[in-house]
Amino acid sequence: MEASGSASWARVSKNLIERRAVKGCLLPTPSDVMDAAVMALKDATENVVSKHLFSVDRTNALSVIHTNAVPESIITTAILRDTNGEYRREYEDSAKCNLAATDLSQDGMWEVVIKSYWRYLRESSGAEVVDRGGVGNTTQSVLSVLILQSTFGKKRLSKNPFKHKGPNVSYKSNLENLRAAFTKIEKYMYYMRPNDPMTKSEDTELRLHELLAYVATCYRWLLWFMDLTDAKVLKNIDKGPVITHGPRETRPPDELVRRHLKSGPAISAGTGDALTLSTATADALIVLLRMSVSWTSHSWKSNTHGVTGAIVAAVELVTLIHHHLQYIINTIFAGYVCWLDGGVENSYLNSALRNQGRFDHFAGKLVPIMATLSWANMEKGTVMWFKYALAKSIVCHGSPTQHYLTVLDSIASKRTGAGLPPGATFGRTANFQGQFGCPPQGPLPAPPNSKTKSMFKRPGRGSVRSLKQLPASTPNMVSSATTYNAGGNTAATSGQGEEAIQIHASGELNDCIWYLNGTYSHQRSDSSSSDNSSCSSTETEYITISSTPSPTREVVYTDPLLGSDEEKDASPQPANTVSEYSSPANSGYMRPRSTLAEEIWQLRDSDYTPYMRPSRAGRPRLRLEDQTLQTLPGCKPPANSPEDNFEDTLFSSSQIYSDNAHSTFRPRARCVDDEYGLTALAALSASQAKARRVRLGTTTPTSANEATEKYTTPSSGGCIRRTLSTSESPESSPEQQERVSSL
């Protein structure tokens, strides 16, 4: 017994410790932690997203596809099954809660809209309209109404914008069709996402291009619609614009819609991967085209209530479309940007952002922009799904792919171009350090008050470790904006001349604030919001403003970007040039756009040429009689000028703009050198012609065909030819010579 027991123990004890250590030690491995994190993210995500994203049919169908593609049949099936709007359930509930928190009735919301429009019209056109003070109880209430009411309100504020019943019934039908098209597009975008955000998806990229081109087209339509509405309102109230400028959108709606339908990304590709999406965007654009006809041809009621009813209906339409478009852009920024070639440097994304920024520049006083962070606080499902998908993708790939790192690098390059300090690493970076980054290896940074600065190593990607300089302050984990500290002090300047950045802690940010003055590269005045909503931070993209206002009220202004297919226009030129703003010490400061500020076009570079030459109020245009400005064959005529020959005709702006509200303008040739005005060129031409006649002596024409003399004086650009037609010799026509000299 003892021998057998001893033999059994010897046999058992050989790998006892190994087996006990393997089976008994529960120390988690990195893979265990990653798996647990992925499962926890999945459980949290399933509670806030549509159940159709995790359906068995969708999971099985995508599991057999190894190209990270999503067939349209899967997308269409999810759209048809989502009959209750589950794709934005969380977002809609949050929006309705925000509207309910305003405690405004239908009449109160009506007052908010109409007061906001009068204030916008006064500042955009200079018309003398009565400003009845504040536009609501609080800024938050005003912004909630202007952003969410038209989409999530219980009913329309203005049901009959037109004078007759037939157009009103047709408008109601078009509005319902437009809402249905918007819902279909948003559902398509929601369910078209592939499973892997770190792998390129060609069909998803094509669909995103179609959506972004559609967004750019709609924003240009909105500018055209605002031009139409403002002109009709000024006509109905017998007011004229004081701040004169050209149309903010020169292309008519039919041309904009036709251009997208014939040469949009989905149609041009010819692959059929976005056939359903292109049909949905075409339906929405066609409805907008019908509405263009309705608002152009149908008249309003002549009484006061009829005009205000049409204004409220127009603002409701604009805010409805604008909310839909910025929903698409915010969704792309929340994660879909990872499937765009080049990330945030994608040309289609830049075009959409440029058109949104242009619309915000001209109509942002009336139609504010929702910050992406605020949108993400309402639409939690999209952000959480991308965190879950990214964690699962990292587990599968083992490390971030080069495609995903390229997208992150594009964001970092944009942040550098926005003017942030070189050492600042706000927000997201491409090195995946995060909040729990590894401790620095090497010398620690010097104290804040030290005169010397130290460098330390931090792990980099791959086998090569690089030296990077980190900021002395704690990275901001909430937003990539540079804000003011809680005490209200601005950023101080160190002895070496570098700015010390002071940031808010995450708990100090007010996430209830919707809108940021200066979301884009211009800064509007504070008339559309309370005095407590001044801008205190700058960023190129969407951010939320902090709860602490800026004590200095300094804003940063940069020139907006215009696309290659957009006509450049001059900014409004007010009658009063006295500015109420004082320039701060910052050398890069540029004044915000305001009716009392200097003209923005004066701040541009010397080689900038606007397509329309504005006329200062009270300064009459000189009518050119018996004179024409002709462009040589090498010069391109302006976009809004007739292309026929103007010889033997009178050049009059009233003939070209007979039906335009802004009839005091004339086209300005692009070939005119900005260093010389037309008056100076005319005087120079007349003086040189007179000097030439004095040298050559007086000549008398011998026939009727020789009664016309042409004096040509090339400008510095060589593109101007001035023709002077007379019925007799220049020496015998002092009136004609005096008229030319006076120019």
Curated annotation (Swiss-Prot):
Chain intervals with Polar residues compositional bias: 573-586, 697-716
Membrane topology recorded in Swiss-Prot or TrEMBL: Peripheral membrane protein
UniProt cross-references to Pfam families, sorted A to Z: Herpes_UL46
GO terms for biological process, alphabetical: regulation of DNA-templated transcription
Disulfide bond sites: none
Keywords: Activator, Host cell membrane, Host membrane, Membrane, Transcription, Transcription regulation, Virion, Virion tegument
Highest taxon in the source lineage: Viruses
Similarity comment: family membership: Belongs to the herpesviridae HHV-1 VP11/12 protein family.
Coiled-coil positions: none
GO CC annotations, alphabetized: host cell plasma membrane; membrane; viral tegument
Subcellular location, record wording: Virion tegument; Host cell membrane
Keyword Hydrolase: no
Compositionally biased intervals (Low complexity): 526-552, 722-743
Assembly: Interacts with VP16.
Protein name: Tegument protein UL46 homolog
Function: Abundant tegument protein. Trans-activates the immediate early genes.
